Swiss-Prot record:
Species this chain originates from: Cydia pomonella
Subcellular location: Secreted
Keyword annotations of the record: Amidation, Neuropeptide, Secreted
Disulfide bonds: none
Family, similarity comment: Belongs to the allatostatin family.
Modified sites of kind Leucine amide: L8
Designated name of the protein: Cydiastatin-1
Lineage: Eukaryota, Metazoa, Ecdysozoa, Arthropoda, Hexapoda
Swiss-Prot/TrEMBL GO biological process terms: neuropeptide signaling pathway
C-alpha cells in the first residue's frame, strides 16, 4: 500500500 507522509 502507498505511504503518505504528512510530516508525522
Amino acid at each position: 500500500s502507498p505511504h503518505y507522509n504528512f510530516g508525522l
